[in-house]
Amino acid sequence: MKKFKNTMAVLLVLISISNANAIVNYNQSKELNLQVQLVHSLDYSSGIDLADKNLNTVFTNYFLLKDELVKTDGVSAAAKAKLLSASLNKVKMNELNKDVHRVWMKVMKNVMADAKGIAATEDIKSQRVLFVSLSKKMYDLVKVAKYDSAVYYQFCPMANDGKGAHWLSKENAVLNPYYGSKMLKCGEVVETIK
């Protein structure tokens, strides 16, 4: 009789454990299913895939850097360039479409070098020299990648020692990052990229 009671006790414990595991597995399955549904609703309802979101962050950080150069704030420009570098590192090349990937591979090293160079100095003149090169490569990238809104490709004929220089802006209004308040409105929109 004692053996029977012990066997029954062990059997009850095993059944309890089995039921507990089933409940845990069911709850985990429900949670995982909910997470999958959430990911699908985030990725597809917006119409933007993860790679596009990462590139949008890159462009947004470029625009923030440009705004600090407009303000002639070398300290803040260096900080924004660090953000740009960090966002460049987060782009997953294998998630880019073929055309974007081709351009990304062509410009990525130079874009990263320019961003790191701007981040490494607080000298506004040095930052602006690097921004000329950075803007050329970012233009190549924005031409093939989608951004959330229109991008304005702007040009100042006096920048870059009179050779002229371009930059990208989210605003149609010209705010010159190469001269800041000295010649804030110097330049024009030469292309609208949608």
Explain the meaning of each model-derived region.
Residues A9-L11:
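Structured mid-domain segments that build the active-site/substrate or prosthetic-cofactor binding neighborhood
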Residues V13-N19:
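Hydrophobic h-region of N-terminal signal peptides that target proteins for export
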Residues K2-T7, N19-K194:
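Intrinsically disordered, low-complexity terminal tails/loops enriched in metal-binding residues
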